[in-house]
Structures are given as C-alpha cells and as structure tokens.
C-alpha cells in the first residue's frame, strides 16, 4: 500500500512539475504572440499612413515638368519646332494657332509610350517634356470660352521659346487671352507678339496669365479687356518670374497695367525694331 501511495505521490509531483513547465512555456508563447501582434499593429499603421498620404496627393504630384532641361540626351523628345500657321482657328476652349494645350493626358498610357526607369515602387513619378521652338502664328484665333492664345491656348506645363504671334486673338465669352499663350504655368522666353487682343479678364500681350516670362517683347492693341490687362501679362503667379521683357505701348503697362523696370519695361516701337534679334516680320 505504501509503495502504491508513493508511486501516486511521485506521479502527482511529476504532473505538477510538467504543469509548471507547460504554464511557463504558455506564458512565453502568449508573450511572443503579444509581441507579434504589437508589430502587426505598427505595420498596419504604417500602411494606413502611406495609403492616406497617397489619397491626399493630386494628380499633379505625380508629374514633373522637365521641359526646361536638356532632354536627357533626347533633344527631339516632346518637341515642336519651326511650325507656322496662316489659317483661322476657331474653338470653344484651349484654342491656339499651333497647339490647343500643352498638358498631360491622364488616360493610362493610351499609346503605350511610357518608359519605366528604376525598380518597382509604389512611389512613382512621370517625367513630362513639352517644348515649342521658333513657331509663328499669323492666323486669326477665336475662342468662345477660356484659354485662347496666338501660339498655344493653355500651357499646364512646358516651354515656349522664340515664338511669334501676329494674328488677332479673341475670346467672345472667356478669360485668359494672350498674344503667345492664353495662360502659361510653364516657361515663355524670347518670344514676340504684335497683334490685336480681345477678351474678358486676364488679357496680356504675351500671356493672359503667366508663371515664367523672360526676355519677350510685345507691341499689341487690346480691343477689349475688363480686369487684369497688361502689355506683357494680365497677371502672374505669386512666386512667378518676370524679367527682361519690353513693352512697346504708349499707355498700357506691362503687368496688370503697371510697368516695372527690368521686368516689364516700356520702350518705343522703334527701339524694339532696332534690337538685334528683332524678327523682320515684327518690324514691318
């Protein structure tokens, strides 16, 4: 009997020891699971933050305008040069003698012309290049609504250099009318405008509204303009660049009716014509 009691006692003691071991291991496993759960929460929070950040982005955040760069070894990429228009152009919105708009088409790669650079990533950007060089408009440009320009109606991005606008530009019921561009959020340089302009608000000799306008010349007549009217630009972006432009107008100032030395400076038509780079057509 005593031997049986001793055997049961040993069995119970061993069972108790085993239970203690299992309990310790269970505590360790639970602690490990809790640590894993905490890390999962951290990862989920990071993913949620990344998703929220992407949701807060506009489409423009995915595009970088590289039109003012050298073309990354591809000088003809995104380039229009030495085009001329002598015909009348009519349209509703985004009307121009050479191009209606310089902008990004948001439909996903309709022509299979995207080039991928780098490894796969959720944080991606598109590089956009749109350059217009030495183009001339002589035709009459007529729009019904916003963004009517002698050379291009709307520049969401891009660069226009050495272009000339001679044909009359008008919008019957719209804003943003310009001898070169109706509105430009890109770069306009070394361009010339000698034409008649008519619109509602934001009417300018070079651009109705501009971001960067440099070393450009205008000798224009404005038949109609209500607010923000200038011989170079009707108005500019707050942090825009306006420099080296010349205005051949007796009474109208360069920017919203006011001239600025070194930026939108008044001069005479004879002085404009005497400039070494003045196009022959401009001086006639």
Which stretches of residues belong to each language-model region?
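Predominantly extracellular beta-rich ligand-binding scaffolds that present long acidic/polar faces
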Residues: 1-284
């Amino acid at each position: 009997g005593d031997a049986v009691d001793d055997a049961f006692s040993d069995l119970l003691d061993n069972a108790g020891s085993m239970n203690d071991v299992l309990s310790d291991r269970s505590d360790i496993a639970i602690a490990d699971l809790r640590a894993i759960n905490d890390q999962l929460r951290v990862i989920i929070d990071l993913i949620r933050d990344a998703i929220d950040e992407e949701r807060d982005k506009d489409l423009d955040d995915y595009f970088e305008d590289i039109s003012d760069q050298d073309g990354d070894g591809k000088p003809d990429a995104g380039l229009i040069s030495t085009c001329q228009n002598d015909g009348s152009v009519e349209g509703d919105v985004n009307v121009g003698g050479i191009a209606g708009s310089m902008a990004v088409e948001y439909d996903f790669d309709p022509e299979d012309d995207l080039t991928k650079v780098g490894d796969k990533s959720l944080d991606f950007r598109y590089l956009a290049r749109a350059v217009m060089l030495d183009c001339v408009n002589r035709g009459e440009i007529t729009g019904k609504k916003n963004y009517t320009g002698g050379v291009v109606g709307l520049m969401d991005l891009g660069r226009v250099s050495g272009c000339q606008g001679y044909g009359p530009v008008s919008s019957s019921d719209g804003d943003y009318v310009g001898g070169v561009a109706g509105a430009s959020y890109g770069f306009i340089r070394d361009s010339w405008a000698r034409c008649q302009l008519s619109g509602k608000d934001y009417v300018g000799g070079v651009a109705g509204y501009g971001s960067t306008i440099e070393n450009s010349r205008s000798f224009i007549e404005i038949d109609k303009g209500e607010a923000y009217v200038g011989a170079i630009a009707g108005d500019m972006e707050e942090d825009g660049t306006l420099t080296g432009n010349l205005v051949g107008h007796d009474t109208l100032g360069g920017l919203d009716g006011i001239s600025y030395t070194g930026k939108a400076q008044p001069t005479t038509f004879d002085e404009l014509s005497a400039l070494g780079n003045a196009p022959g057509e401009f001086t006639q």
